[in-house]
């Protein structure tokens, strides 16, 4: 397994509006934990579409991991040109900083936004060009990843593609363990 697509909720879908929110710390720690497992299995590339939330936090984790794993690569495959144009200035600056660190950048559609079909085609592109997806999504809290999950399940049923769908129970267990370990270190 050489290439993984990581996706999930957008930050506002998790009611996270600041990068210094404690939830971001725990989500990034969880993403790092997951990626380290796959690095041990030969992971070389992490791909994202460049969406706010899980995807950009994943990019930040990959950039940090490169200190210890310099062969790890980050690819950003956007649906179309200018996908950040409606974002506020702070989010655009964050994206641009991450984009400068990417090893590969490309858009599936070499046009501006034309319609929702661009997102669907980009999702399909990601499935066709990766070995696995890590999807942070829970059926209990619907959000934008539900559309991708449907496509992912259909794709898995037709191919030998693999995925790791992370529900809130797994996240909560990880966070509880992490907090317990932190509490133990203070005793």
UniProtKB/Swiss-Prot annotation:
Top-rank taxon, per record: Bacteria
Q: Which Gene3D superfamilies match?
A: 3.40.50.450
Q: Which family does it belong to?
A: Belongs to the UPF0398 family.
What the entry lists under InterPro entries is as follows: YspA
What is this protein called in UniProt?
Answer: UPF0398 protein SH1465
Q: List the disulfide bonds.
A: none
